[in-house]
Regions:
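Short, surface-exposed amphipathic charged segments that create phosphate/polyanion-binding patches used
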Residues: 73-76, 94-100, 227-232, 270-281, ...
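Nucleotide-sugar donor-binding catalytic core of glycosyltransferases
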Residues: 113-155, 254-413, 433-439
Length: 504
C-alpha cells in the first residue's frame, strides 16, 4: 500500500494557512502536446517524471510566492531535465506543441498568479483580435430572471449598445469561446454573478483589457465571502450603499463608486388604482428573511447581550445596523466568513424592527403584508398577510392602489435604500420609510416629509398625511418628477458608461 504524500504547510496569497502535497490527484492535464509544461511542481518535483513517463525534457512555471516558501531545499529536488520558463514565454507560436499539466493546489492557494497564467493559455489569437465590424456590446452575467438584469438589458439597448447575456456558470473555456465571436466594451456583474471564487473569468477579461463593473446591490462583504482571491479589488466596483466605500478601499479596492438603485422602467407604466380594496390600507411588501438565510447564517453564534443593547437602541429611534454590529464585534470583514456573524446580528435586529413597526401600525390602522408564509409566525393575527407577489406582475398596481406603502430598510445596509424608494413613486404610489443616510440622494426637504426614526414618529407621519391630502398629493407629484428625471436605471448606466468612457 502506497503511503499518502506528506502535506507541506504554507500560507496562501491571502495569508491564510494552507497545505500542498504531491498527491497524484493534485495534477490535471489541461491540454495534450509533445512538450510537457508543469503549471506548478508541487512539493515533490522529483516524483513528477515517474508520474508522467515517456518524455525526456520538461518545462515548468512556478508561483514565486510558493517557491519562496518551499525554500532552497525544494529547488534542489528539481530534476536536471526540468527547465523553468516565465509566463511571458507562453506565446501562441510556443504553445501549439505544449502539454499543460496544472498543479491544482497551487491555483487554489495562489489564484492571482495562476489565473493570469491560465488566461494566457486559454486565449487564442482569435480571441485577442478585435472585431471592428461588430456593434458595440456589453456582457451581462445572468438570465432574464436575474436581479436587475431585465432593467439593465433594456436600458443598454436604449443607449445604443447590444446587451449579451452570459450564463454565470459558463466556465472559463466556454467564456473564451464566446469571446472569439467578439469582445464587449464592458462586462457587468450584479452581486458577483459570473465571478468565480478564484477569478478565472476576471483574469480572461483583464488579459483582454475589458473593464469589469461589479455592481454590489446587497452587502458587499456578504457577497465577498464567496471569493477566495483579491482579484475583485482590481475591478470597478459600484455599491448601492456608500458606507461600504471606505472599508472596501481599505482592502485595496482601487475604484469604488456610489451607484444607488433606481426605478424600474415598468413601474412608470402602472395603470393606476386597480385594487380599490387597498386605498385605505397601509401596505408592507417584503420577506421576513432573504432566500437562503438559514444556510448563509447557519454557523453564526448569537450574542444575547448585544441583542439586548440593540433592542434598547431601537426604542430610542436609533439603528443598530451592520455598521453598529461591525463596531461592537470588530471581526474581520474579509477574507473568511466571520463577517456573517455581524450580518446575523443585523438580520435578527432588522426582523425585530419590522415586527415592532408593523405591530404598532396595526394597533391604529389596517395593515396588509405581502410576503412569505413565515410572517404568520411573527405578526399578530389582525394583520392581513397575503402571498408574495411577482415583481413584474401586480406589484406596480399594489403600489399605486394603496393608501401608502411602508418601507422598513434592511439593517444589512447602513446607508442603504431599497427598490421601493424608487418604484413606489414611479408607480404613482406614496411611500413612508424609516430614516437612513441613504435618503441623502433626495432633496432633504422632501425626504423629511416621508421619513421617521421611531414607531411613534411613523404613526404621527401617517396621521399628518391623512389629515392633509393636498400635502400628500404635492409630495407624491414632486417625488414622481424627481424619480423620472434623476433616478432611472438608464441614468445609472449612463453614469457607468461615462466613468469608463464607453460610447454606444
Amino acid at each position: 500500500m502506497h503511503e499518502r504524500p506528506a502535506a507541506v504547510k504554507i500560507k496562501s496569497e491571502l495569508g491564510l494557512p494552507g497545505s500542498v502535497s504531491a498527491a497524484p490527484g493534485s495534477y490535471i492535464v489541461l491540454k495534450k502536446g509533445t512538450l510537457p509544461v508543469f503549471l506548478g511542481l508541487g512539493p515533490e518535483p522529483a516524483l513528477l517524471e515517474k508520474m508522467h513517463p515517456g518524455y525526456e525534457n520538461f518545462l515548468y512555471i512556478e508561483c514565486p510566492d510558493l517557491e519562496r516558501q518551499l525554500g532552497p531545499s525544494w529547488k534542489q529536488k528539481i530534476p536536471a531535465n526540468f527547465t523553468k520558463i516565465s509566463p511571458d514565454q507562453l506565446v501562441p507560436e510556443n504553445m501549439e506543441q505544449m502539454s499543460f499539466i496544472l498543479y491544482t493546489p497551487g491555483l487554489k492557494n495562489f489564484p492571482e498568479f495562476w489565473t493570469d497564467v491560465l488566461a494566457r493559455i486559454r486565449l487564442t489569437p482569435e480571441a485577442l483580435r478585435s472585431s471592428p465590424d461588430k456593434p458595440a456590446s456589453v456582457f451581462i452575467f445572468g438570465n432574464e430572471h436575474s436581479l436587475l438584469v431585465p432593467e439593465i438589458y433594456w436600458e443598454i439597448e436604449q443607449l445604443g449598445l447590444t446587451p449579451i447575456l452570459i450564463n454565470p456558470a459558463c466556465g472559463p473555456d466556454k467564456l473564451c469561446e464566446i469571446l472569439r465571436r467578439g469582445k464587449p466594451e464592458l462586462v457587468i456583474s450584479v452581486n458577483l454573478q459570473g465571478m468565480d471564487q478564484l477569478g478565472e473569468h476576471f483574469a480572461i477579461f483583464n488579459r483582454l483589457n475589458i473593464p469589469v463593473a461589479l455592481w454590489m446591490v446587497d452587502n458587499p462583504f456578504h457577497l465577498l465571502t464567496s471569493l477566495k482571491s483579491r482579484y475583485w479589488t482590481r475591478a470597478v466596483i459600484f455599491v448601492t450603499d456608500n458606507w461600504f466605500i471606505k472599508p472596501l478601499k481599505a482592502f485595496g479596492a482601487s475604484a469604488v463608486h456610489h451607484l444607488p438603485l433606481a426605478a424600474a422602467p415598468a413601474f412608470f407604466r402602472s395603470t393606476g388604482r386597480i385594487k380599490p380594496e387597498l386605498q385605505d390600507k397601509t401596505v408592507f411588501v417584503g420577506r421576513s428573511s432573504f432566500p437562503g438565510n438559514r444556510s448563509f447564517f447557519g454557523a453564526c453564534p448569537s450574542y444575547p447581550r448585544l441583542e439586548s443593547e440593540a433592542l434598547e437602541l431601537l426604542s430610542l429611534g436609533q439603528r443598530p445596523d451592520f455598521a453598529w454590529w461591525t463596531r461592537r464585534l470588530n471581526l474581520p470583514l474579509w477574507p473568511g466568513n466571520r463577517v456573517r456573524e455581524m450580518g446575523f446580528g443585523a438580520e435578527r435586529t432588522g426582523l425585530v424592527w419590522k415586527k415592532i413597526c408593523l405591530e404598532r401600525l396595526a394597533h391604529k390602522y389596517p395593515v396588509v403584508v405581502y410576503g412569505d408564509k413565515n410572517w404568520k409566525n411573527i405578526l399578530p393575527q389582525q394583520i392581513d398577510i397575503q402571498p408574495e407577489v411577482d415583481y413584474y406582475g401586480p406589484l406596480a398596481s399594489i403600489y399605486s392602489s394603496s393608501g401608502c406603502i411602508l418601507n422598513l430598510t434592511n439593517m444589512h445596509l447602513p446607508h442603504g435604500l431599497t427598490q421601493r424608494h424608487f418604484d413606489v413613486w414611479a408607480a404613482h404610489g406614496f411611500l413612508i420609510t424609516d430614516k437612513t443616510r441613504g435618503l441623502e440622494v433626495f432633496p432633504q426637504e422632501l425626504a423629511r416629509e416621508i421619513s421617521f426614526c421611531a414607531p411613534r414618529e411613523m404613526l404621527d407621519l401617517i396621521d399628518r398625511l391623512n389629515r392633509d391630502s393636498s400635502l400628500k398629493n404635492q409630495i407624491q407629484a414632486e417625488f414622481y418628477k424627481l424619480i423620472k428625471t434623476r433616478h432611472t436605471y438608464r441614468q445609472r448606466l449612463e453614469n457607468i458608461f461615462n466613468l469608463l468612457n464607453i460610447k454606444g
